């Protein structure tokens, strides 16, 4: 069972709500994934009414909402978006995203750390999206973040675990859950992340942009489950030389 800020999650697959062709398809995919934590971009919500056709079905489905600050270019904008989410959605949870460059969508480490410190002081449950930087992740943990969300590769690229060496370091040192976010493009990527010891993965593009999002959601669910079970079972040690599984010459001496 995964626990974040005192809340237990049976599913270690978190999902997003963007890029789906319809709200109905989004909901069917989320249901198939069995995800219990779903991200929602504040920029998609009508600021005048707080309405969006995805909020009602998500609430009816009983999933926990994780509003994100996507679109924020600095700490000030991210803090404003988080406060808005708390007021409009009634949640302390926030996925902190600050990426000032719209071309590459790389997270701004300096602004993210500053925003995280302020938000944690204000009582938010902060889950920051960041580079796979072990030093930064430790700093975020120290200021009170409930989890860290290092990227596997650039958002939406489906490149997989390009940052694997650094993700391993983050997992090894972390005292809070590590959720691999961004760039996971195939169920095999998700399974591998879980085999490394990640606590969860967040997937959006790979499911939403699939020819069959519902089937892909099922695949990711199974991949995450299998990857976690493999990690808990204990993977065999990687060797540089061949190691025989049984004596090679014993029968010759009989």
UniProtKB/Swiss-Prot annotation:
Pathway: Cofactor biosynthesis; thiamine diphosphate biosynthesis. It catalyses: [ThiS sulfur-carrier protein]-C-terminal-Gly-aminoethanethioate + 2-iminoacetate + 1-deoxy-D-xylulose 5-phosphate = [ThiS sulfur-carrier protein]-C-terminal Gly-Gly + 2-[(2R,5Z)-2-carboxy-4-methylthiazol-5(2H)-ylidene]ethyl phosphate + 2 H2O + H(+). InterPro entries: Aldolase_TIM, Thiazole_synthase_ThiG, ThiG. It is an enzyme of class 2 (transferase). Its EC number is 2.8.1.10. CDD domains: ThiG. The active site is at residue 95. GO terms for molecular function: thiazole synthase activity. GO terms for biological process: thiamine diphosphate biosynthetic process. It is found in: Cytoplasm. Keywords: Cytoplasm, Schiff base, Thiamine biosynthesis, Transferase. GO terms for cellular component: cytoplasm. 1-deoxy-D-xylulose 5-phosphate binds at residues 156, 182-183, 204-205. Its main location: cytoplasm. Catalyzes the rearrangement of 1-deoxy-D-xylulose 5-phosphate (DXP) to produce the thiazole phosphate moiety of thiamine. Sulfur is provided by the thiocarboxylate moiety of the carrier protein ThiS. In vitro, sulfur can be provided by H(2)S. Homotetramer. Forms heterodimers with either ThiH or ThiS. Belongs to the ThiG family. PANTHER family: THIAZOLE SYNTHASE (PTHR34266:SF2). This is Thiazole synthase. The gene is thiG.
């Amino acid at each position: 069972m995964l626990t974040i800020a005192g809340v237990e999650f049976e599913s270690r697959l978190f999902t997003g709500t963007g890029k789906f062709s319809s709200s109905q398809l989004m909901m069917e995919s989320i249901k198939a994934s069995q995800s219990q934590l779903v991200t929602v971009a504040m920029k998609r919500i009508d600021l005048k009414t707080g309405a969006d056709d995805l909020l009602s079905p998500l609430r009816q489905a009983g999933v926990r909402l994780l509003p994100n600050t996507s679109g924020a270019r600095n700490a000030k904008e991210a803090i404003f978006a988080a406060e808005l989410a708390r007021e409009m959605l009634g949640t302390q949870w926030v996925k902190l995203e600050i990426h000032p460059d719209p071309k590459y969508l790389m997270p701004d480490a300096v602004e993210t750390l500053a925003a995280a410190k302020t938000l944690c002081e204000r009582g938010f449950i902060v889950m920051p999206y960041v580079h796979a930087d072990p030093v930064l992740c430790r700093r975020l943990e120290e200021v009170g973040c409930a989890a860290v969300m290092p990227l596997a590769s650039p958002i939406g690229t489906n490149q997989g675990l390009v940052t694997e060496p650094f993700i391993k370091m983050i997992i090894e040192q972390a005292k809070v859950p590590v959720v691999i976010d961004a760039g996971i493009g195939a169920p095999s990527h998700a399974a591998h992340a879980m085999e490394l010891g990640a606590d969860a993965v967040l997937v959006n593009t790979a499911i939403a942009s699939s020819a069959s999002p519902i089937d892909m959601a099922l695949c990711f669910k199974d991949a995450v489950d299998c990857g976690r079970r493999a990690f808990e079972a204990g993977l065999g040690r990687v060797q540089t030389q061949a190691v025989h599984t049984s004596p090679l010459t014993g029968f010759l001496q009989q």
